[in-house]
């Protein structure tokens, strides 16, 4: 059974065949339908739609359940995410192509179908695969270029439903969450107090991806092939994305490579500057790393609450929730000498 909808595999397969046969105007064969690992918030399914010896590699991204808990984890709705991906593509950002946004008559719940792009997304493979050695050497620079493209998308092109999130708003939201979850960690409160007293450099507002990190980029031997998972996108300070990418939690053990575990600050900022014409100082990026560590703490607390309340007792929720102490260690290291 799949998520809370109790949609069986055979029913999912049947509904997909009917939908894809309509999309591709012919009786398709559905090959290799399988759920991909990872993804604490969404279900991700890979498949190939085959018609007349032509194969269409696809990804289905859908809500895992009838109860919409997107507000609790801070996500935009999937229809808006699909719209945003299309807008990003129109502005030169490497993203999958949106094939279809699900509607109730499709019988598949809430979600969308998109093209399955080549490349690897698993962080450990990106960091260790010998075939990606040359790609890793320029990956931080390429990430900087991609982020600058995202941040340059005119705000008037962005869906109006996207939230505008300022630094003060972030601090207030995190305080509410801490209080709601009993505020049992003095480290988290210490870090939040520091962030409240030390606001980052103000920047002109831009589209912020919100989850740009190792694990949400597809990489092959030539470099970045697609940027994934736009569910946390919002309008805010563009340097947030740069700091988030450099968060210790997304280095996967490669602590000496601050950019995603594969690169250095200077390479990231050089790539950003090459497209945007400017780049923040490293210290400004590191300031946002503190926000990243606090955001990770909020994510862990939220997942833990979903699991404990049995609102979603999946192993993915529990696995993230148990990592709460990591954020405390990261925050103490980041704040060392600042408080």
Please annotate each region the language model reported:
Residues 34-192, 197-204:
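ATP-binding pocket architecture of kinase catalytic cores
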Residues 207-209, 214:
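Catalytic-loop of the protein kinase fold
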Residues 1-27:
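Juxta-kinase regulatory segment immediately upstream of eukaryotic protein kinase catalytic domains
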Residues 228-233:
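Activation of the activation-loop gatekeeper triad in protein kinase-fold domains
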Residues 162-165, 279-291:
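All-alpha amphipathic helical-bundle segments outside canonical DNA-binding/catalytic cores
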Residues 205-207, 225:
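Conserved protein kinase catalytic-loop anchor
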Residues 241-277, 291-310:
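Active-site activation/catalytic loop segments of kinase-like enzymes and analogous catalytic loops
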């Amino acid at each position: 059974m799949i998520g809370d909808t109790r949609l069986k595999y055979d029913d999912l397969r049947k509904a997909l065949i009917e939908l894809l046969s309509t999309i591709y105007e012919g009786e398709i064969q559905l090959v290799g339908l399988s759920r991909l690992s990872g993804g604490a918030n969404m279900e991700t399914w890979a498949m190939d739609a085959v018609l007349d010896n032509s194969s269409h590699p696809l990804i289905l991204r859908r809500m895992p359940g009838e109860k919409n808990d997107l507000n609790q984890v801070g996500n935009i709705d999937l229809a808006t995410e699909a719209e945003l991906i299309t807008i990003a593509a129109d502005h030169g950002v490497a993203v999958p192509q949106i094939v279809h946004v699900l509607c109730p008559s499709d019988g598949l719940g809430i979600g969308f179908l998109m093209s399955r792009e080549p490349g690897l997304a698993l962080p450990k493979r990106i960091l260790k695969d010998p075939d990606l050695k040359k790609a890793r050497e320029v990956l931080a620079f390429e990430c900087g270029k991609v982020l600058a493209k995202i941040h340059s998308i005119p705000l008037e092109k962005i869906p109006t439903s996207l939230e505008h999130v300022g630094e003060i708003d972030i601090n207030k939201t995190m305080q509410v969450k801490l209080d709601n979850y009993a505020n049992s960690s003095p480290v988290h409160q210490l870090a939040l107090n520091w962030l409240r007293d030390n606001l980052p450099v103000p920047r002109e507002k831009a589209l912020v991806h919100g989850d740009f990190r190792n694990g949400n980029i597809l990489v092959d031997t030539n470099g970045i092939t697609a940027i994934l998972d736009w569910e946390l996108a919002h309008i805010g300070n563009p340097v947030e994305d740069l700091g988030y990418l450099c968060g210790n939690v997304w280095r996967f053990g490669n602590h000496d490579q601050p950019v995603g575990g594969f690169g250095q600050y200077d390479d990231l900022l050089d790539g950003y500057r090459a497209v945007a014409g400017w780049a923040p100082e490293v210290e400004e990026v590191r300031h946002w790393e503190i926000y990243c560590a606090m955001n990770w703490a909020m994510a862990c607390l939220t997942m833990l609450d979903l699991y404990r309340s049995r609102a979603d007792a999946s192993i993915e929720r529990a696995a993230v929730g148990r990592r709460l102490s990591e954020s405390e260690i990261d925050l103490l290291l980041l704040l060392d000498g600042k408080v």
